[in-house]
């Protein structure tokens, strides 16, 4: 389950939760969630997990409103031209259900909603990667009522954004996935196994169990393993020897990440992050 803090202009904090079924939604409300959200069929990055068709969306929205809660519909896919053809037709019955807002990331889809449904409230999705107050101010000028900030921000940065755009609602993740690249625009799933996270098929490769191998470049420039540095997962306690070995790795030196005997992936790390260098990266 994911959770968010919604820091509104009234300084009231509310809790939001992602869900995939009526049971999830009812548990979320029973345990104090103020709002929930679910993806629109065909236009959400949660299409593999989403049990909500249009009929279920309508029931979910009605149940939420009957409890005095809010229900947001996520429309955050990165659309190709083919997805634009029927977008307004498919969205019209969803708008008629009166969700409290649409969560969106693509400027083109946002423009289309603004043109056809100017009364609908739009929240900027984390997929749009808002990381500074100028970006937040821009989206406010476009008529959006809330911005979901990228996970990469510190508390000080979030506070600075709120100070510079005090009348914009701010939403932040307090629990959830760790994306490769900026929040939501993940290349790792497609890189690892050709399942595109930006089209709703994320395999959560960021949560797999990896081994780390020291590596070096050979005469042809290929990265080859030297020795294994670490065997534990990110979520296990490491003993002193393992910690020492990891500390010996220097920024800028290549490593190999291994999931199983057949798969090894070259990576480099510096003070700014971790990099996977491969021609597959261009597919995004």
Write out the residue ranges for each language-model feature.
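Active-site pocket-lining/capping segments in soluble small-molecule metabolic enzymes
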Residues: 10-16, 20-130, 149-152, 157-284
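Generic N-terminal leader/presequence segments
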Residues: 1-3, 234-235
């Amino acid at each position: 389950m994911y959770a968010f803090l919604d820091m509104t202009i009234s300084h009231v904090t509310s809790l939001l939760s992602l869900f995939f079924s009526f049971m999830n939604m009812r548990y979320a409300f029973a345990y104090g969630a103020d709002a929930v959200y679910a993806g629109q069929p065909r236009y959400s990055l949660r299409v593999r997990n989403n049990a909500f068709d249009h009929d279920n969306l309508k029931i979910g929205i009605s149940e939420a409103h009957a409890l005095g809660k809010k229900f947001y519909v996520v429309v955050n896919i990165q659309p190709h031209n083919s997805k634009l053809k029927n977008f307004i037709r498919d969205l019209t019955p969803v708008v008629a259900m009166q969700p409290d807002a649409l969560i969106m990331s693509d400027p083109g889809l946002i423009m289309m909603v603004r043109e056809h449904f100017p009364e609908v409230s739009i929240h900027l999705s984390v997929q749009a990667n808002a990381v500074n107050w100028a970006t937040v101010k821009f989206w406010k000028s476009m008529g959006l009522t809330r911005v979901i900030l990228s996970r990469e921000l510190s508390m000080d940065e979030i506070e600075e954004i709120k100070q510079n755009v005090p009348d914009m609602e701010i939403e932040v993740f307090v629990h959830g996935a760790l994306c490769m690249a900026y929040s939501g625009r993940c290349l790792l799933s497609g890189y690892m196994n050709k399942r595109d996270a930006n089209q709703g098929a994320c395999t959560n490769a960021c949560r797999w169990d990896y081994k780390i191998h020291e590596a070096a470049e050979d005469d042809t420039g290929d990265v080859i393993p030297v020795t294994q540095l670490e065997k534990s997962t990110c979520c296990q306690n490491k003993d002193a020897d393992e910690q020492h070995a990891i500390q010996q790795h220097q920024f800028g030196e290549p490593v190999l990440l291994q999931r199983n005997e057949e798969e090894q992936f070259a990576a480099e790390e510096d003070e700014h992050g971790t990099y996977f260098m491969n021609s597959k990266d261009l597919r995004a």
